[in-house]
Design a protein with these regions (language model features):
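Short His-centered aromatic/hydrophobic patch
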Residues: 89-95, 115
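A conserved, positively charged/aromatic
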Residues: 103-139
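Glycosyltransferase donor-sugar binding loop
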Residues: 39-44, 197, 222-238
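Short alpha-helical donor nucleotide-sugar binding micro-motif in glycosyltransferases
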Residues: 79, 258-259, 265-269, 284
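Conserved donor-binding/catalytic core segment of Leloir-type glycosyltransferases
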Residues: 7, 187-204, 210-213
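Conserved acidic donor-binding segment of nucleotide-sugar-dependent glycosyltransferases
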Residues: 310-322, 330-334
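Active-site donor-binding acidic/aromatic loop of nucleotide-activated sugar
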Residues: 232-237, 250-259, 265, 316
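Short hydrophobic beta-strand element within catalytic cores of glycosyltransferases
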Residues: 38, 295-298
């Protein structure tokens, strides 16, 4: 296998799935003997990329305004200096800057994009389809790309996201963690734990989750909403808490806020939910929960549907059908009820498939 020079472009390197994936992929490239160059405005993962042997070049390609396009000149300099084989764009603003940089290059690298979402502004997003090849993270995203941008099947490869079994596995939480958890959340002890891991947002299904708990209304169960609320969402969070109070559910639902021990929370959860009312492009929390040994449930659409169809069909429920969600929850939550199949969505598969795609595209270009 020939050695590659790969450039990845994204706005910043702070906390997020795309950012962490870029960092992990950079590390994997270096481990396999390739050269990895990441271009962004920097952030928390910047030093980790460098420590793992990658190169990070800081450019202000993160701001969504026309002046950012002036950074195309800087990208041209980088490409002429490093002569990459592959440029991989992971976000729209950097992709536009790259688009104008490529216009100034005589010898162009292979250009790949990953659609990490179902973008809501097609005119702004079309640059992600103006590439040699596109990666879709699910069939749902592939269909969106085909229908919105008229990209041919042969120019799209589905490479699902994956999780790292070192982080998400079935090793039981240690006693120290459990003691600290039950000290902080004594209301969860000896309960059937139902968990919704999500940031607080109107489309993420927290309302539906509260409705589910109201319908079950049994203190043998305790519900956790695990995730942050941004300042913009504080009013919505207050509305949710008022709804809980009005329904008399205060003792049955806990908002934990942002946590860095989500893998252990999955492990103590009897069921983990994805109830997003818009189709998820993939459904990362669903595979993380399955990998951690939890049962999972979700609405029958988007990337969540694709994962559950493969690994746990019993967890699928028709969109917004709270009665069915309750009925299936009561069945699945029983201790002896079957758990999902082994998780097949692994980060190692994502890495191997992406590198193989690069090699295939380079071979086809000769």
């Amino acid at each position: 296998m020939s050695k590659l020079k790969v450039v990845q472009l994204l706005p910043e390197l702070n906390i997020g799935g795309v950012e962490r994936g870029t960092k992990d992929f950079s590390e994997a490239l270096v481990q396999r003997g390739h050269q990895s160059i990441v271009i962004s405005n920097g952030g928390l993962f910047e030093q980790e990329i460098i420590n793992a042997g990658g190169i990070h070049l800081k450019l202000p390609i993160h701001k969504k305004n026309p002046f950012s396009l002036l950074q195309a000149k800087e990208l041209v300099k980088v490409y002429k200096e490093y002569e990459p084989d592959i440029v991989h764009v992971r976000s729209r603003m950097p992709a536009w800057i790259n688009y104008y940089a490529f216009k100034k290059l005589d010898k162009k690298p292979i250009l790949v994009s990953t659609f990490h979402g179902l973008y809501s502004t097609p005119m702004y997003s079309k640059v992600m389809a103006k590439v040699d090849h596109t990666i879709a993270i699910s069939k749902t995203v592939r269909d969106y790309i085909k229908n919105t941008y008229s990209v041919e099947d042969k120019n799209i490869t589905i490479i699902p996201r994956g999780c790292d079994p070192l982080l998400f596995n079935k090793i039981k939480p240690d006693i120290n963690w459990l003691n600290k958890w039950y000290e902080e959340f004594p209301q969860t002890k000896n309960k059937t734990i139902l968990t919704l891991p999500t940031r607080i947002s109107q489309w993420k299904g927290v309302d539906s989750f509260i409705d589910l708990i109201a319908n079950i209304n049994n203190d043998a169960f305790h519900a956790l909403v695990v995730g942050p609320a941004s300042k913009k969402k504080e009013k919505y969070l207050n509305d949710l808490q008022s709804k809980i109070k009005d329904k008399g559910l205060g003792s049955l639902i806990t908002f934990t806020g942002s946590r860095n021990d989500i893998s252990n929370i999955y492990k103590i959860s009897d069921i983990v939910y994805n109830l997003s009312i818009k189709p998820e492009p993939f459904g990362r929390t669903t595979i993380e929960a399955i990998a951690s040994g939890s049962k999972v449930m979700g609405w029958n659409h988007g990337g969540t549907k694709e994962i559950l169809e493969e690994l746990y069909p019993d967890g699928l429920v028709e969109l917004n059908d709270i009665a069915q969600l309750k009925q299936q929850t009561l069945i699945i939550s029983k201790e002896n009820y079957a758990k999902p199949k082994e998780n097949t969505f692994l980060s190692s598969k994502l890495i191997d498939s992406t590198i193989q795609l690069y090699q295939d595209l380079l071979k086809a270009s000769l």
